Amino acid sequence: MDSTLKCTILLILLGLVVNAFSVTDYEHCENVVKKWATNSLKHESKEDKHALKDLLFFLHVPRTGGRTYFHCFLKKLYSSSLECPRSYDKLRFDPSKEKCRLLVTHDDYSISSKLPRGRTSVVTILRNPIDRVFSTYEFSVEVAARFLVHPNLTSATQMAGRLRSKNKGVSTLDIWPWKYLVPWMREDLFARRDARKTRGTSDFTSGDPYNMEDIVMPLLNYINNPIAHEIVHNGATFQIAGLTNNSYLPESHEVRHCVDKYNNLGDYVLQVAKKRLDNMLYVGLTEDHRESATMFANVVGQQVISQLVNSNAIGKGANVNNSEQGTSFSDSELDQNTNSDEKGNETTSSDDNEVNQDNMTVEKLMDTYEVCISGLRKTQTRRRIASLKRISPANFTKEVS
């Protein structure tokens, strides 16, 4: 047989094998994703989604304003004794404990598999995905920049480790997704600062804060990096679907891998996320902040007040203690525990200790919320300005927690 013909036949056979493997791999992925989606939808509650259950799970999607809701709504309603212990890296409480009534966490929806079925209501806030990506990038830079007070990365890392082991509070470095994003950005900031010192450069010409590569990782580099691709891309959808890299589901990694490899399979994930949103007690929108806050007070706040009054639980915990349980993980976006200078300024302006929960009404709740949010924003602004000074002239405008 002619050698050219042999080569042609060999190439054809090789192509058929590769194609067969590709089809088999796609079918495998399709089966994996469809099985997960079917099981997820099958376990969705058929009960009245408008009625507040015994446990309120606030699924905090990062950079949507959830910290404001926690401090200015939920901490005004629930005493610290009713808060579930933090579950920032693993479940830290017995879900059957009746006294535990409020869980606020960056954990994804998969944690609900550990919560009392039929006795848990879920609430969340969503934000325009593009704005949320910008804000995630900016917050990664803002927190990482706080470490630049140290002479080098080794010093910063060691000090952070010592403070985290000494303090009972929860650091941002313990919280998903910041426990991945901040160290990555921190290492990059120190590398760029060291490079500037080596070159002896201090003149920066770019006026675009998202493209100042001499000072900070450009936004384009950030969003195209595998770390951001794993955590930030479609982050809210994966969080609501329970498929983040912090998921409690053993199949989550494979499902996420298949969806990343075959984008059309993402529709199954989207349908599960949409169904879960539809079954939640409340879904707010960052862009419609005022309207969403008013709705939260009337839909969720009113039921919490009624529920706690009936159980004689409201009004007994206005003075929030400073125990580990009372140290809010949502404080992590202000409570960095990175160095003594930062730590000295870590105060919460929401005046948790001054709230009288007796005779609480929706109207009083909204009045308290307005005062609280004003103070909280001032604190966040001061902290943001102080942090960004360390990477001047880079500066950002978006600011939602």
Annotate each predicted stretch with a short phrase.
Residues 2-401:
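Membrane-interface amphipathic segments in extracytoplasmic regions
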